[in-house]
Amino acid sequence: MNGTWLIDNLWSHPLRLRALAPWLDDDGIAALTRPKGAPMTQSDVPLLDEAMELLGPDPKIAAQIAAKNAKRAQEEQFAQDTLNSVGLGSGIVSSQMLVDQMNGEGGEFIAQRAAADREWTYGHVVVDEAQELTAMDWRMLIRRCPSRSFTIVGDVAQTSALGGTRRWDRTMNRLFGERRWDLNELTINYRNPQEVSDLASDFAQKAGLYISTVNAVRTIPDAVRRIIVDGESDTIATAASHVAQLAKQFVDADGTGRVAVIAPSHMLDPLRSTIFSTLPGTLGQQETNRLSEQHEWDAQISVGSTESVKGLEFDAVVVVQPGRIEQDAPSRLVAASDLYVAMTRPTQRLVIVRTGEDETALQL
């Protein structure tokens, strides 16, 4: 029995799930159930870690690790004896350093060892996008840092995980205890123009999201543009036209400049197709080919969901059908966070393209 088997066995047996979690309704059981042998997901990682912790180490693997550690201890003792024999026992070079050098092990190898060892611990851990972590995620991280020395970076207004953090005190007090952690809030917005920052902040406050009082350092006239069209098909053509103009203004052949389109999931493929068929008329075919062949992680023109752009910034952003983005979210607060993320990505220009019906459904 190992952690993978345990989690797989749990998810593939709905009757067992019902017995172990009687508070779940039929929809909850159905959402968790999957075929036996199905691939593990990102959300399974902390559950696997918990299962491995409860089950304990695999005896075979534990024996291999013990043998490896014993060999390492012998090598370090031999190295220490050697250093002592030449009068260098208390010098700058330690026995551990000498063994690493003899075995060809440097900092990179140590990092590889840490990645391969589930029980490896650290003196300090830096967590980014911390608002997205669930209670089980935090349990996994705390195991890696027994000293509980953390630098935690996040924005609770951007929380999209249903089990994430909406208030820092509720999560931090449980993890570290009251008055045993410090909160420092950023109050200066260097990314967004004042016009974009004000729009996003007003929306977040009305939606019930917690945000710090932020002052933007730049003002750019016409930084926010709102475009209303007749139907959803018109939003695609209009967004593509604006992307072409924004690309001409902000995207350079030297690889600098970024434009992003953020839209509901069902519109992403038609948007991407229409945009790259529109670009040649503005940028020429050669430049369009260059842009279309870029890797997704470094694309100068990106088309994606709110989740795909979190943590990134762009010179210009086109948000398409924000009301539909809100409608597709799993909860009201997640919807608000998704839109707040979308509106706070641009450093220069925010364009909102939507139908009149979409505008009626959500005022921005």
Predicted regions located by residue number:
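Conserved helicase motor core of SF1/SF2 NTP-dependent helicases
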Residues: L55, Q80-H124, E129-L364
